[in-house]
Amino acid sequence: MDPDDSNLEGAPEVVHWKAELFVAAAGELTECPRWDERSARLLWVDIYEGTLNSCDAAGGDRTSMSAGQPLGSFAPRTEGGYVLALETGLALSGHDISAWSPVGPQRGLPSVVRSNEGSCDPYGRFFAGTMAHDEASHGGELLRLDAPTAERPAPVPEQVIPGTTVSNGIGWSADGSRAYYIDSAERRVDVFDYDGSTGAMTDRRPFVSFQPSDGYPDGLTVDADDHLWVAFWGGAAVRRFTPDGRLAGIVDVPVPRVSSCTFGGDDLGELFITTARYQLTAEEFAEYPLSGSIFRCRPGPVGRPVRRYAG
């Protein structure tokens, strides 16, 4: 990490935690964990399998359903069902994601790009990024799907940020005035001023930057104290940052490819952490056999309820 942007590791105020196994062999490329308080279940995607998976609070009673194509991210809808970020584009479904309806323009299969991480803002909009399968520079974008209104009963996705490379985590401050965003290739978290009335993101600037030794920032979540928790692909950790970008804590994860995280459980005090075995060599997988599992810890801070798409 850049010492100009955060505390140095090992400083006395940096708290350390260790993650423990929650669900073994959850998937090849698990991402987008979300806690659904209505069902008291953890949900996550396995991107290239195209599945939306779930388990109960103890890690049991696992379920899986397929969208029939790669699924980068999702969000629950206010009235039930899901908004899906598929390889071909955005879609809406009921509880069964195999029966989805496209929203806006769709890409043909096979596509040179696919959808990646996504999340909802505090006002019911859904944001999702795209990336090239080969991670070509500037081959993706960040899209926004507004909630339907009387004036626009059938909104379509709109481009928010063009020319991204690996569009990843996005989250918002509690008051909705700031949006945090990760393009992993940039090795930093950026912050924007956010207009809740329009969904506009303006005045992009670095929030915290990282060194190659840290790995790549991937997914993120924002806790009830407005601290960011950032997963590090290749970094074997989730790191917590204060609202002014100082390192406040590190969760050590026993596998290298940490993809995302979310808070859940009855009190929103469990931090659930997804990981991947995607593109590991046989030797690497032998060294880290729990890759692709979901981990958890109870760090003390708590999260906020999942934000739902209002459409």
Regions found by a protein language model. Give the residues of each.
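A short loop-to-beta-strand structural motif that recurs across blades of beta-propeller domains
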Residues: 51-53, 89, 140-143, 188-190, ...
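Beta-rich, blade/repeat-based domains predominating
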Residues: 25-39, 67-83, 109-125, 160-178, ...
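A short helix->beta-strand "capping" segment at the edge of beta-propeller domains
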Residues: 8-26, 56-59, 104-107, 204-205, ...
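Blade-level signature of beta-propeller repeat domains, shared across WD40, Kelch, NHL, RCC1
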Residues: 264-311
